[in-house]
Amino acid sequence: MPIEGKLLRLTWTLAAWEDYEYWQGQDRKTLKRINSLIKDCLRHPFEGIGKPEPLKENLSGFWSRRIDDTHRLVYCIDAQALVVIACRYHYQPG
């Protein structure tokens, strides 16, 4: 587990990167919010802005932060990396 406050490495799944590219072309305000959430996640993965919450059931081990009412940033911590899983829509439990 990372040491609190230590800057993590950032990686993306292909689907998450496609989500991010979507926001680059569609909504700069949402993109700015995602960037702020990621910056905070890199320093404090389990607390901070966006109401971080651990996910359950088949998404156990993943975390979610609110981008807005509809969209979530979903990520996990893998060794010393923050892995972004999604940054568009809601996660799909079950």
Sequence positions of predicted segments:
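A short, surface-exposed loop/turn module that caps and links secondary-structure elements
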Residues: 39-66
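Enriched for short, Lys/Arg-rich terminal
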Residues: 1-9, 18, 22-32, 36, ...
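Short coil-to-helix segment of the ABC ATPase nucleotide-binding domain corresponding to the Q-loop/switch region
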Residues: 13-14
